[in-house]
């Protein structure tokens, strides 16, 4: 079954096509630091972009952070993700790992990543290697540092905006420290917008990726990451990035003036105003230990891309992930809400329900879908990658699967009820109307996830990274109250609903 694009995807694709049509065979202009107008353009059009050269960052971090990157790479902890783009599975050219607050997740391109926890107070994490534990500690230390720097940058931005000053962009230099005095409420707001709860680590060796796409609008060269807005972030929250390109990249690009445009041997980050063909884009070279910050609404109003250099590169991208529906505590609470409708459950797994109120049943089936498709299948689709670093998620996922299995029995109890003789026709119709949509969604998504686990892309993955279609069971499995394939169940429900309405 061909997937139908969402309205947002269709609009985005239409904008892209219109932009390419307007360009025809010409490139949009973009600026590099060697261009005379570069800093003026930055000041006028990109004032919420802050850059810090490596020399202004503590030397201790420059020693520890690269060691942490290399440690995780050595232990094979970074993975290319199989993401979903316009209904197709695509293997990312960049390898990633998510580190952050215990129980947090971060979703991008329809893929939910689960944190390898960093060692925060009050949480015991058992790592598979002492070196991995030390690396996670380092990224927590980097996170704390970047959080302080971000708050200071936001304070300075607030002062400049309040004074309506046309300040020189905060780049290639220390942040100003004086003359800043926000109110208590403002200070709380600034801290919340810099309260980084995860970092998404990235790695790519461009020499092993000969098929990288060309940047389509400006002619900037090979892209490691295409134009995008970072997803799933708290509104107006900042993003901080620490960049580390491996040895060799600096020596090869001493004289950038010999190039027209950006030096293709040096990694760059590119920025543009979304869907704007008038304002020149910016490309900023990224050398070892450089950092940049996207403040306030910059991530919403502008797009950015990462332009590949010639050497391998790591980055640590610190974010305030929007976790209102993305933490372990959240999904456990949702499960408990659904299970409140269980009256009795027997030793054989059968259950009876307290209420057959249509709204209660609908809510229960929607939670059933949420835990299955947003958590269990997302987790197991990524194979056994998380066990390489820690067993932290093993017990919670086993527990979630047990709760999900009880919800299967709850669905079975509802199906028994709609077949019960003597059930008033109107009540039967209301129950069927409440559960038919979530069960149809469940059937369609199970079919989709099962197909994804056998797609051409995943067949190329190493054994440890291959997706596990879980939960999955055969038709006659005595431990399961309902079949995996709900085609017949959904068809029967539709027939019953038509009969009840006739």
Swiss-Prot record:
Presence of the UniProt keyword Metal-binding in the record: yes
Tissue: Ubiquitous. Detected in brain, brain cortex, hypothalamus, cerebellum, liver, pancreas, heart, kidney, white adipose tissue and skeletal muscle. Most abundant in the brain, particularly in hypothalamic nuclei governing energy balance.
Cofactor: Fe(2+)
Gene Ontology MF terms in the entry: 2-oxoglutarate-dependent dioxygenase activity; broad specificity oxidative DNA demethylase activity; ferrous iron binding; mRNA N6-methyladenosine dioxygenase activity; oxidative RNA demethylase activity; tRNA demethylase activity
EC number(s) recorded for this UniProt protein: 1.14.11.-, 1.14.11.53
Locations listed in the record: Nucleus; Nucleus speckle; Cytoplasm
GO terms (BP aspect): adipose tissue development; DNA alkylation repair; mRNA destabilization; regulation of brown fat cell differentiation; regulation of lipid storage; regulation of multicellular organism growth; regulation of respiratory system process; regulation of white fat cell proliferation
Name of the protein in its database record: Alpha-ketoglutarate-dependent dioxygenase FTO
């Amino acid at each position: 079954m061909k997937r139908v694009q969402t309205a947002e995807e269709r609009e985005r694709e239409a904008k892209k096509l219109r932009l390419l049509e307007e360009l025809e065979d010409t490139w949009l202009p973009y600026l590099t630091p060697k261009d005379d107008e570069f800093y003026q353009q930055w000041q006028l059009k990109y004032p919420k972009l802050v850059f810090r050269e490596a020399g202004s960052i503590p030397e201790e971090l420059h020693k520890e952070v690269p060691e942490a990157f290399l440690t995780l790479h050595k232990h094979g902890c970074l993975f290319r993700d199989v993401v979903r783009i316009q209904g197709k599975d695509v293997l990312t050219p960049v390898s990633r790992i998510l580190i952050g607050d215990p129980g947090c997740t971060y979703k991008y391109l329809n893929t939910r990543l689960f944190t390898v926890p960093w060692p925060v107070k009050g949480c015991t994490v058992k790592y598979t290697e002492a070196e991995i534990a030390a690396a996670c500690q380092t990224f927590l230390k980097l996170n704390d540092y970047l959080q302080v720097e971000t708050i200071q940058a936001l304070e300075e931005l607030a002062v400049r905006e309040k004074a309506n000053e046309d300040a020189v962009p905060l780049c290639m230099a220390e942040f100003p420290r004086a003359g800043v005095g926000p109110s208590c409420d403002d200070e709380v707001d600034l801290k919340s917008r810099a309260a980084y709860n995860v970092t998404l680590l990235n790695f790519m060796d461009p020499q092993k990726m000969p098929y990288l796409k060309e940047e389509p609008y400006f002619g900037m060269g090979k892209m490691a990451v295409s134009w995008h807005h970072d997803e799933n972030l708290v509104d107006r929250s900042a993003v901080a990035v620490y960049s580390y390109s491996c040895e060799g990249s600096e020596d090869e690009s001493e004289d950038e003036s010999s190039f027209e445009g950006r030096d293709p041997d040096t990694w760059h980050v590119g920025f543009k105003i979304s869907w704007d063909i008038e304002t020149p884009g910016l490309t900023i070279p990224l050398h070892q230990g450089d950092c940049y910050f996207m403040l306030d609404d910059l991530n919403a109003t502008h797009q950015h891309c990462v332009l590949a250099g010639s050497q391998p590169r790591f980055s640590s991208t610190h974010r305030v992930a929007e976790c209102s529906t993305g933490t372990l505590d959240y999904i456990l609470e949702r499960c408990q809400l659904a299970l409140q409708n269980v009256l009795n459950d027997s030793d054989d797994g059968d259950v009876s329900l307290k209420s057959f109120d249509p709204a209660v049943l609908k809510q229960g089936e929607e939670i059933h879908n949420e835990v299955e498709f947003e958590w269990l299948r997302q987790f197991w689709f990524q194979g056994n990658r998380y066990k390489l670093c820690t067993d932290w998620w093993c017990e919670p996922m086993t527990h979630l699967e047990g709760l999900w299995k009880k919800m299967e029995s709850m669905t079975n109890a509802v199906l028994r009820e709609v077949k019960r003789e003597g059930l008033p026709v109107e009540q039967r119709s209301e129950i069927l109307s409440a559960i038919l949509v979530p069960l149809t969604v469940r059937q369609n998504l199970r079919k989709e996830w099962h197909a994804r686990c056998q797609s051409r892309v995943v067949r190329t993955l190493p054994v440890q990274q291959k997706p596990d279609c879980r939960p999955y069971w055969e038709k006659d499995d005595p431990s399961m109250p309902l079949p995996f394939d709900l085609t017949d169940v959904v068809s029967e429900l539709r027939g019953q609903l038509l009969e009840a309405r006739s």
